[in-house]
Amino acid sequence: MKHTVKLLVALTALAALIFGTAAFAAVYDQDFTLMNNTGDTIVSIYLSPTRANKWRAEDELGNYVLKPGYEVDINFSPWDEARYWDIRAEFDDGTYAEWYNFDLFSISRITLNRNGKAVYE
């Protein structure tokens, strides 16, 4: 009986850990699809929590470029569990543009426009 209670407690704790981790991962899923509608080739994409004063050092495109009219899936593990993020795109002509306050808990697709506007869903 004593071992049964210990086993039941251990299994309950394990179930809570497994389901709690899955729920946490679902809540903090911040991956999204990024569409380039700027008219220019994007050579780098940087993300930053809206409240931060610096961009992440990691270029989300890696060695790739994002040509006009194309899209890419951004799969990242945020170092900050922030809800709102900013995006900085650097273009092949040396210029850049920034867009602000994307709720990555609820947005799954972002289309960047060169005029500083973005469409998201």
Residues covered by each model-derived region:
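Extracellular beta-sheet/turn segments enriched in Thr/Pro/Gly and aliphatic residues
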Residues: 96-121
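Sec/Tat signal peptide C-region and signal peptidase I cleavage site
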Residues: 19-26
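A short, solvent-exposed beta-strand micro-motif common in secreted/extracellular proteins
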Residues: 82-92
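Bacterial N-terminal signal peptides that target proteins for export
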Residues: 1-10
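Bacterial N-terminal signal peptides
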Residues: 9-19
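Short acidic/proline- and small/hydrophobic-mixed sequence motifs that coincide with surface turns
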Residues: 40-44
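Asparagine-centered strand-capping/turn motif at beta-strand->loop junctions
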Residues: 34-39
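Intrinsically disordered, low-complexity Pro/Gly/Ser/Thr-rich segments with frequent PxxP/GP/PP motifs
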Residues: 55-80
